[in-house]
């Protein structure tokens, strides 16, 4: 998909989010990172809340950065339930920059992903170990029907709360559901 933002827009938002995190958290002498995985709608946010009960970790989830996209409102108006496809590249770029910057400075992190592939969590674990981090991988797995229903319920709940909803495309959800078992076997 064609890039729908400028490098300058990305850099400005990245710097804003980075400042926000740095103003609320401090680097650690013995940093920890938790890599969270699971299909969309499985309950990763609930697991994240349990791990971060004392608010000691910066939580990085690409979905949290959609609303910062410079054309977020227009994309949502034009594409509705499919809008997440048009902000995915943006979310990935912001996420990668934050992981890189905060990782080098040794902040405690929680990084949320889907385990759509085995390569990314292996790459991240290796990178963080080289930086001196204690690395943990936590996975939430439920039946595909339950997680698909979870994505629909999340979408409807966001509408009720007056938030801009995001819908996980069924094909993406199903891809992760069908891949996660083999990917976990590869990782372990």
Residue ranges, per PLM feature:
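Conserved GTP-binding G-domain of TRAFAC-class P-loop NTPases and closely related GTPase folds
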Residues: 149-188
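Conserved nucleotide-sensing/catalytic segment adjacent to the nucleotide-binding pocket
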Residues: 55-131
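Phosphate-binding P-loop
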Residues: 23-31, 102-103
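ATP-dependent NMP and nucleoside kinases share a basic, alpha-helical "lid"
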Residues: 115-158
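The conserved Walker
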Residues: 39-40
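Conserved lysine of the Walker
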Residues: 44
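N-terminal pre-Walker A segment at the start of P-loop NTPase domains
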Residues: 1-26
